[in-house]
């Protein structure tokens, strides 16, 4: 073989017994750390979040290096790019006041909530519906509800659950939704009025007016590996419970809140109050 390769026997054996360099050893250890975090996130995290987690563990590495290693390993986040607004609808409709006017910032929790409904497909029960309530300060899903029917009760129960979970000062709370009939129904409006909650509305055909809420539903549909594979309503509800309560609120870190989880950020705000 040495003759074929035109190298000396000494060089050949030196190559066989060569020890990995320090840099190669570091890369091997780094690769394992990256794979561990990538697997723990169920392939949801890309380089920025994995880099932040490794930094928090005390590893001094650059984002570019994490990106290079992930490319070398052939792994990337299963989440696609964030939603961007499409063309605006030209349909005329009765407009209601948009109080928050695209300002999704909040100095503390339970001051601005966003809510919306999304469609969930199941193999046996067909379309089901998820209504969620998002806190603008913590990025936490403070309340949610699932139903086989899309009606005012679906929208209302999600908000009732949020109020029960958070026990907010409702007189200082704004809740923002689109203009779909579930949110403009007499039942929904009466409940908000009873608790002195101010209702803010997106302009018809402008989903970007509720962007963080839209982003959550989009993110959920990309990150839940069982999406479009739910057997029935019960199966979907269990999976969504696990995603929201076990993963999203308590384990998923967010760049907008300093790479903390929503629950940890809420706890921090509560302790600081």
Model-derived features with residue positions:
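Mobile genetic element proteins and their domesticated derivatives, centered on retroelements
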Residues: 1-2, 12, 34, 50, ...
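Basic, flexible linker segments flanking DNA-binding modules
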Residues: 2, 9-108, 206, 261-270
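Generic alpha-helical secondary structure signal
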Residues: 4-11, 29, 154, 158, ...
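C-terminal domain-tail junction helix/linker
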Residues: 20, 193-197, 219-273
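RNase H-like two-metal-ion nuclease catalytic core shared by retroviral integrases
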Residues: 89, 177-179, 185-188, 201-221, ...
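An active-site-proximal beta-strand-loop segment
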Residues: 106-142, 148
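Short small-residue beta-strand/loop micro-motif enriched in glycine and branched aliphatics
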Residues: 138-144, 199-202, 226-227
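Active-site beta-loop-alpha junctions of metal-dependent nucleic acid enzymes
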Residues: 145-168
